[in-house]
Amino acid sequence: MTTSRRIIRVVAAVLERDGRYLVTQRRPTAVLPLLWEFPGGKVEAGETDAQALKREVMHRLGADVDCGKLISFVSHPYEHYVVDLFLYECRLLTDKLEARAVNDFRWLASAEFDQYPFTPADEASMNKLLGVG
């Protein structure tokens, strides 16, 4: 008997500044605690991807973003659900960032990614973007 897993649509912002990318660390109480990811979150019913990105980045970092083109998509199965992760090239419209709904945030060069434990879906996206996976 096959059971279908719930599909969760997630969007994330790829924000680059001076060759470094903004990543956030999940809170200790979150699903996949303390793992790193590109900033973003779930798309709510009735929202566009751009609206969800603006809402999620504001909620997590207190920052406004301009959502650009879709640059990557991966579908990653977890035990009880599947994450469809859409990565968008975005532009930060705010200079100041605050760790509001994240444990921490960092600007990393792509060569530093392997020094941080990322969520499986984000890791698959990074591998696809960097041509590693």
Residue ranges, per PLM feature:
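Short secondary-structure junctions
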Residues: 60-67
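Active-site-adjacent beta-strand/loop module that shapes the phosphate/pyrophosphate-binding cleft
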Residues: 64, 74-97, 104-106
